[in-house]
């Protein structure tokens, strides 16, 4: 029996081979197909960028964005691979562009009106298919944009001049509220309060606690910035999300109380024309069934946080630049005296404040706050000879482009860079085209009003050795000073006194 078992003639060799060969063939074919797929993926891409390398490339590039921040990672990759290059974010092919011709193409075409970001992250903060800033549903975005456009132009823009000037005067009269024990002014907090107050009066009209809401806005922004590109697995770990959940809830709860008060005032108003504003228009649209309550609340929230979040930092950087460049301050003061004199600033002064406007433009070019734009291709396209597939993410690196093309002294702060008219394709601090910043005109007017009103009353100085170039910053969704660092305060000296303001 044993010999029979050991005898090869008792085995059906043909049967054994026929069973083994198909299994081996399938394994070899699968491996070959996978290798061909990887090889084909890398070889068919003509766009410069890091290697795919069996999926490790996308993992590394996404981790770099999470570690360095969006803005810093974009600068790193453009410097390494050129002004039109490809990485992966959230596993999706993403182009990083700092070339003006390519940016112009993306901004002007309607098939790039969508943005991109983690769906779970945007749901977490309430922006997924709601509001305007990161609403990636083109139909819903188009439904709310007219409300923003109407509120931020025409009569609203004219009203803003007086409202903003009054708010600045009111806050400067109470400057001790934002001074430390040495009399140094916390400019960021001051600007955030002024802009929140102005936005509230214009768009909501409900009394609020500025100090508390400003803190909540910063917490919300930190959550938004931190969660925008997080992988889905992050949101399945509850303890990782807890801090951000509280920050988002704090602002949303505070805003909901204010908006409910607005609803009550509308329902009990004897004359509706007395309370018609941005929030009222949205609430009426909700009653007509055009918008959901959640979308209305998110739109109002975004309208109130926009200026305290970004424009306040822009003016903060501007004041530091004024302190470092006294000749620029002198030129601005001469123009302010000539155009405005001793009276209140008016809307018809805006076009005459050319030096102030050039200063604002050069400040936004040299030290931007919003230095990138995130978009998604909604259809196949070709940009500067490179094929772009539908669904491709695109990041426009505006800050880098503003230092690469056209300007005679791109790495210096000088008004010479705007001595001549700059073609708008080379300077886009607010973007342009169908998804340009809805508030770009009112933002420019608001910054002029703030600078004129403040500089007429105070000369500004930084603490010794402080300037924007040496300031620690975080370059993520936007570029902000590191507020954990010291000596971000400034010294305000009244124009009619040689002594520093004592708060």
UniProtKB/Swiss-Prot annotation:
UniProt GO BP: female gonad development; lipid metabolic process; response to estradiol
Localization: Endoplasmic reticulum membrane; Microsome membrane
Superkingdom in the source lineage: Eukaryota
Residues in coiled coil: none
Gene3D superfamilies the record matches: Cytochrome P450
Keywords, in A-Z order: Endoplasmic reticulum, Heme, Iron, Lipid metabolism, Membrane, Metal-binding, Microsome, Monooxygenase, Oxidoreductase, Transmembrane, Transmembrane helix
Cited InterPro entries: Cyt_P450, Cyt_P450_CS, Cyt_P450_E_grp-I, Cyt_P450_sf, Cytochrome_P450_Monoox
Organism listed in the record: Capra hircus (Goat)
Pathway info: Steroid hormone biosynthesis
Signal sequence residues: none
Annotated protein name in UniProt: Aromatase
EC numbers, comma separated: 1.14.14.14
Membrane-topology descriptor: Multi-pass membrane protein
Protein family (similarity comment): Belongs to the cytochrome P450 family.
Cofactor(s), names only, from the UniProt record: heme
Chain's role: A cytochrome P450 monooxygenase that catalyzes the conversion of C19 androgens, androst-4-ene-3,17-dione (androstenedione) and testosterone to the C18 estrogens, estrone and estradiol, respectively. Catalyzes three successive oxidations of C19 androgens: two conventional oxidations at C19 yielding 19-hydroxy and 19-oxo/19-aldehyde derivatives, followed by a third oxidative aromatization step that involves C1-beta hydrogen abstraction combined with cleavage of the C10-C19 bond to yield a phenolic A ring and formic acid.
Keyword Lipid metabolism: yes
Residue spans crossing the bilayer: 19-39, 53-73, 303-323
GO molecular function ontology, one term from the record: iron ion binding
One GO cellular component term noted in the UniProt record for this chain: endoplasmic reticulum membrane
Binding site for substrate: 309, 374
Predominant location: endoplasmic reticulum
Disulfides per UniProt: none
Protein encoded by which gene: CYP19A1
Catalytic activity: testosterone + 3 reduced [NADPH--hemoprotein reductase] + 3 O2 = 17beta-estradiol + formate + 3 oxidized [NADPH--hemoprotein reductase] + 4 H2O + 4 H(+); androst-4-ene-3,17-dione + 3 reduced [NADPH--hemoprotein reductase] + 3 O2 = estrone + formate + 3 oxidized [NADPH--hemoprotein reductase] + 4 H2O + 4 H(+); androst-4-ene-3,17-dione + reduced [NADPH--hemoprotein reductase] + O2 = 19-hydroxyandrost-4-ene-3,17-dione + oxidized [NADPH--hemoprotein reductase] + H2O + H(+); 19-hydroxyandrost-4-ene-3,17-dione + reduced [NADPH--hemoprotein reductase] + O2 = 19-oxo-androst-4-ene-3,17-dione + oxidized [NADPH--hemoprotein reductase] + 2 H2O + H(+)
């Amino acid at each position: 029996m044993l010999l029979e078992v050991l005898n090869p003639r008792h085995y059906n060799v043909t049967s054994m081979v026929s069973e083994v060969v198909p299994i081996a063939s399938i394994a070899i074919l699968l491996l070959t197909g996978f290798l061909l797929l990887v090889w084909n993926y890398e070889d068919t891409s003509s766009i410069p960028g890091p290697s795919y390398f069996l999926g490790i490339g996308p993992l590394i590039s996404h981790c770099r964005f999470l570690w360095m921040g969006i803005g810093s990672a974009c600068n790193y990759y453009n410097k390494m691979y050129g002004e039109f290059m490809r990485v992966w974010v959230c596993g999706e092919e993403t182009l990083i562009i700092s070339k003006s011709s390519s940016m112009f193409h993306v901004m002007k075409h309607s098939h790039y009106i969508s943005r991109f970001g983690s769906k779970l992250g945007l749901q977490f903060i309430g922006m997924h298919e709601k509001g305007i800033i990161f609403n990636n549903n083109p139909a819903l975005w188009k439904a709310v944009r007219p409300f923003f456009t109407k509120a931020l132009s025409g009569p609203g823009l004219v009203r803003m001049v007086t409202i903003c000037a009054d708010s600045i005067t009111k806050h400067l009269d109470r400057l001790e509220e934002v001074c430390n024990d040495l009399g140094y002014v916390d400019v960021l907090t001051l600007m955030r309060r002024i802009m929140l107050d102005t936005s509230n009066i214009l768009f909501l009209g409900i009394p609020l606690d500025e100090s508390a809401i400003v803190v909540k806005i910063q917490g919300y922004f930190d959550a938004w910035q931190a969660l925008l590109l997080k992988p889905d697995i992050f949101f399945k770990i509850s303890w990782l999300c807890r801090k951000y959940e509280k920050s988002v809830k704090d602002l949303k709860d505070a805003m909901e109380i204010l908006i409910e008060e607005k609803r009550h005032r509308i329902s009990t108003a004897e004359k509706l024309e007395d309370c018609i504003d941005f929030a009222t228009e949205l609430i009426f649209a909700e009653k007509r069934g055009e918008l959901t309550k959640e979308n209305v609340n998110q739109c109002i929230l975004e309208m109130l946080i926009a200026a305290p979040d970004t424009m306040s930092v822009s003016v903060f950087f501007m004041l530091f630049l004024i302190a470092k460049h006294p000749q620029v301050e002198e030129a601005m003061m001469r123009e302010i005296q000539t155009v405005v004199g001793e009276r209140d600033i008016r809307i018809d002064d805006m076009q005459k404040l050319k030096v102030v406007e050039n200063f604002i433009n050069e400040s936004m070019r040299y030290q931007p706050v919003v230095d990138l734009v995130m978009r998604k291709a909604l259809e196949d396209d070709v940009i500067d000879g490179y094929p772009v597939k539908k669904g491709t993410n695109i990041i426009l690196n505006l800050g880098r482009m503003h230092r690469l093309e056209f300007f005679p002294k791109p790495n210096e702060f000088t008004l010479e860079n705007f001595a001549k008219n700059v073609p708008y394709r080379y300077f886009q601090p607010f973007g342009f085209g169908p998804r340009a910043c809805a508030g770009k005109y009112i933002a420019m007017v608001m910054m002029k009003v703030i600078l004129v009103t403040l500089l007429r009353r105070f000369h500004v100085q930084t603490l010794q050795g402080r300037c924007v170039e040496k300031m620690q910053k975080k370059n993520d969704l936007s570029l902000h000073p590191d507020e954990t660092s010291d000596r971000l305060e400034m010294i305000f000296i009244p124009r009619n006194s040689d002594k520093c303001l004592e708060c």
